[in-house]
A protein has these predicted regions:
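Active-site neighborhood of HAD-like aspartate-dependent phosphohydrolases
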Residues: 1-49
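Metal-dependent catalytic neighborhoods of phosphoester/phosphodiester hydrolases
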Residues: 92-99, 123-127
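Short, solvent-exposed loop/turn segments at secondary-structure junctions
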Residues: 12-15, 20-21, 86-90, 119-123, ...
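Structural recognition of alpha->loop->beta junctions
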Residues: 100-115, 169-170
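Acidic, Mg2+-coordinating phosphoryl-transfer loop and its flanking beta/alpha structural elements
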Residues: 132-166
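Substrate-recognition element of Asp-dependent hydrolases with the DxDx(T/V) motif
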Residues: 59-61, 65-97, 104
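Conserved Lys-Pro-Asp/Glu-containing loop-to-beta segment of HAD-superfamily phosphomonoesterases
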Residues: 5, 115-142
Length: 170
């Protein structure tokens, strides 16, 4: 397979969102992939996240994320981009996009293209089978594949590297 574009999601792939919710907010985050979330759980989580005005810039790297990113970015360069969602305006996270840019530039690369969108806009970046999305959320992978792209659900950096190798990309 030849890669036209490789898009990295941030939260849960590169940035450890769940650890941030636990350590910065003192809360166990509701499952992002499960069906066991209530609107009340989400509201409480976002209320606590909002207390740290620059929450996204304070997140840690996911285990192995830097090595995974460097391996892919080192091979594909400007064919790699960040495709990350930000919270809806009702969540009051006015600095989310700016903080994600700062985070990527500080920890990964100042040169990589950043695409900051609402979650449901991600599939609009898909141009076909050779357009790859690495994302931790099942629903994002499902939507991406429905648009004809290749989705890799990130379980861990090692697992994602193995999947990229299976596709002949690494």
């Amino acid at each position: 397979m030849e890669a036209e574009k490789i898009y990295f999601d941030m939260d849960g792939v590169l940035a450890d969102f769940e650890r941030g919710v636990q350590e910065i907010c003192g809360l166990n985050p509701p499952s992002q992939n499960g069906k066991h979330r209530s609107p009340g759980e989400d509201d409480e989580m976002w209320a606590r996240i909002r207390l740290d005005e620059h929450f996204y810039d304070h997140l840690e790297l996911m285990p192995g994320a830097k090595e995974m990113f460097d391996a892919v970015y080192g091979k594909y360069g400007d064919r790699c981009e960040i495709l990350t969602g930000i919270p809806k305006p009702k969540r009051g996270m006015v600095f989310a996009g700016e903080d994600k840019i700062k985070w990527v530039h500080r920890l990964l690369s100042e040169d990589i293209n950043m695409n900051i969108v609402f979650r449901e806009e991600k599939p609009q970046f898909c141009t076909g089978k050779n357009c790859i999305l690495i994302d931790d959320m099942e629903s994002n992978i499902r939507d991406w594949e429905a648009y004809g792209g290749t989705g890799i659900q990130n379980i861990s950096a090692g697992d994602t590297i193995d999947k990229l190798k299976e596709l002949g990309l690494l």
